[in-house]
From Swiss-Prot:
It comes from the Eukaryota. This is Lectin-3. Homodimer. It comes from Axinella polypoides. GO terms for molecular function: carbohydrate binding. Stored in spherulous cells in the sponge tissue. The keyword tRNA-binding does not apply. Keywords: Lectin. Possesses D-galactose binding specificity.
Length: 15
């Protein structure tokens, strides 16, 4: 699980 692949879900949670 790379940060780049998990960035999309992480960004949504940060929004």
């Amino acid at each position: 699980a790379s940060p780049x692949e998990n960035y999309q879900x992480y960004v949504i949670l940060n929004l």
